[in-house]
Curated annotation (Swiss-Prot):
It is an enzyme of class 3 (hydrolase). A divalent metal cation binds at D76, E77, D168. The gene is rnhB. GO terms for biological process: DNA replication, removal of RNA primer; mismatch repair. Pfam families: RNase_HII. One of its GO terms (cellular component) is cytoplasm. It comes from Streptococcus pneumoniae (strain Hungary19A-6). The keyword Transcription does not apply. This is Ribonuclease HII.
Amino acid sequence: MATIKEIKELLVTVKELESPIFLELEKDNRSGVQKEISKRKRAIQAELDENLRLESMLSYEKELYKQGLTLIAGIDEVGRGPLAGPVVAAAVILPKNCKIKGLNDSKKIPKKKHLEIFQAVQDQALSIGIGIIDNQVIDQVNIYEATKLAMQEAISQLSPQPEHLLIDAMKLDLPISQTSIIKGDANSLSIAAASIVAKVTRDELMKEYDQQFPGYDFATNAGYGTAKHLEGLTKLGATPIHRTSFEPVKSLVLGKKES
């Protein structure tokens, strides 16, 4: 009779819920064996569910594949809302039918998984471009226009150049066919890939700024208006990376000028 350890090793090789190996092992009354069977079945079901989720997130890409297009770039940005730091956009071209386990809208990915999935995108992408527009430009042109500039910069770095753009809720004035998708980072794998690249890139930048400008908790809040950030603003004033067109930074800077 096989040991439970041997059965566990055998079950790792089973990839289908209908496998005859399960039927055979289910005759074994040992509780340890039944426990391993249940565990393996749950793992297989989780893999099937994940594959279905990823498949559903390729629906926009698959429509474009039917038209003979394969160089499809997903575009997304991070950092529209913060009081400090740049807006960062990423453009990512994934290989045809590429599925990266765990890839999703970056807001839905556990923080501890960010770097792992970012690395998987880096490893598998055909091309990646990153656009970074700083707070000074944001203050000059407004955040919406700055976001478009960041996206255009990211796209310009792609090689090969894309045949079609899938963009998260935005239209760009570029001579490339494009589709604007509401909640694109949750509905397109290409956009989700851009989302995690932009997110990790910006988070790392804000960690560096935290070293330069201590007291605002940038490493944790990424420039968003948390209690610690606002406390730092009140005590220390605005830094060179703060967006002076955003409240409450604007009022704080104006108040200091008037006094």
